[in-house]
């Protein structure tokens, strides 16, 4: 049983028991952590405001025999501008949901925290958040080993989609905006990504 400090990002939370929250964190030192924040639902809780989804935080975790507890937490960055814009909020929460789905407890993915922060910043500034989210999702799927080699795969998919998927897999997320796709093509890419997510 021990306490450890780390930096991380809140991927989500849900209410449990009468006054507690179950918190999903991705941490720099320990990867994905699922922890209990005791009393977090109380109005007077010290956790109030710090457990919001996509808050970047410093956190003290207590690793017990059965449960991990959030002992202390401090918000370092909260992207307040997102919460004042419903469209940006919707898109960033989607990114948090994807990240939470694709990471497993105690699993570490290299540079995920930085990738997630870059994605949020791009969503705040781009006119095409959809392609940023596509690029981010493909990059995580690639990190966890779900993505095939698009240059060598034998498939019935049109080559233009394979080329696009390989581009957003290998290039910086901001470069995804440079590729022009029709609305129909973007929807087709979404369908492909959804199929890939089923294998994750």
Locate the predicted segments by residue:
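Non-catalytic alpha-helical scaffolds and adjoining flexible linkers that form interface surfaces
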Residues: 1-21, 26-200
